[in-house]
Amino acid sequence: MENKFDHMKLENQLCFLLYASSREMTKQYKPLLDKLNITYPQYLALLLLWEHETLTVKKMGEQLYLDSGTLTPMLKRMEQQGLITRKRSEEDERSVLISLTEDGALLKEKAVDIPGTILGLSKQSGEDLKQLKSALYTLLETLHQKN
C-alpha cells in the first residue's frame, strides 16, 4: 500500500535522475575532453561553432540555455586559449560575434570520435536513445517556456 509520502522518495524524483545522469555523463566526457584541453561547456560551444562557424553571443546563449553571465567568462577563456575570436558586429554594435579560429576549427577533427565513444558507453539501443533524446527535448522545451 502506498503512503502519502511515496512521491517524496528520492528514487521517485525525476529531477534527481536527470541531475545524477547529467553528472555521470559529464564525468565520462572529462578524460576525452582533457586530451583536448577543453571543458564540457566549452565542448558544447565548439559543437555549435563547428556547425555554424560564426554566431552571436545571444544566439549561442539561446542554443546552450546559458545566460550571458555564464557564457561570457567561458568565451573569454576560449579566446585566451586561441579557440575563438570575439568581435562587435558592424551592423549592430550591441551584438558580439563569436567565430572559430583555425585552432578551434582543427579541434573538430580531434573530437570526431567523442560522440560515438560516449554513446557506446550507454549500452542502449539506437531506438531507445532516439526516444530518450526526443522525450528530453520535449521536457526541456516545456520547462524553458515556463520561464
Swiss-Prot record:
SUPFAM superfamilies: Winged helix' DNA-binding domain. It is found in: Cytoplasm. SMART domains: HTH_MARR. The modification S-cysteinyl cysteine is found at residue 15. Pfam families: Staph_reg_Sar_Rot. There is a cross-link at residues 15-16 (N,N-(cysteine-1,S-diyl)phenylalanine (Cys-Phe)). The keyword Acyltransferase does not apply. One of its GO terms (cellular component) is cytoplasm. Cys-15 is oxidized by organic peroxides to cysteine sulfenic acid (Cys-SOH). This can react with the alpha-amido of the following residue to form the sulfenamide cross-link. Oxidation or cross-linking results in the loss of DNA-binding activity and the inactivation of repressor function. Both the cysteine sulfenic acid and the sulfenamide cross-link can react with free cysteine or bacillithiol (BSH) to form mixed disulfides. Further reduction of OhrR by free sulfhydryl compounds restores repressor activity. Residues 11-141 form the HTH marR-type domain. Inactivated by oxidation of Cys-15 to a sulfenic acid. It comes from the Bacteria. Keywords: Cytoplasm, DNA-binding, Oxidation, Repressor, Transcription, Transcription regulation. Residues 57-80 bind DNA. One of its GO terms (molecular function) is RNA polymerase II transcription regulatory region sequence-specific DNA binding. The modification S-bacillithiol cysteine disulfide is found at residue 15. InterPro entries: HTH_MarR-typ, MarR/SlyA-like, Transc_reg_Sar_Rot_HTH, WH-like_DNA-bd_sf, WH_DNA-bd_sf. The keyword Cytoplasm applies. The modification Cysteine sulfenic acid (-SOH) is found at residue 15. Its main location: cytoplasm. GO terms for biological process: negative regulation of DNA-templated transcription; negative regulation of transcription by RNA polymerase II; regulation of DNA-templated transcription; response to hydrogen peroxide; response to stress. PROSITE patterns: HTH_MARR_2 (PS50995). PANTHER family: ORGANIC HYDROPEROXIDE RESISTANCE TRANSCRIPTIONAL REGULATOR (PTHR33164:SF5), TRANSCRIPTIONAL REGULATOR, MARR FAMILY (PTHR33164). Organic peroxide sensor. Represses the expression of the peroxide-inducible gene ohrA by cooperative binding to two inverted repeat elements. Homodimer. This is Organic hydroperoxide resistance transcriptional regulator. The gene is ohrR.
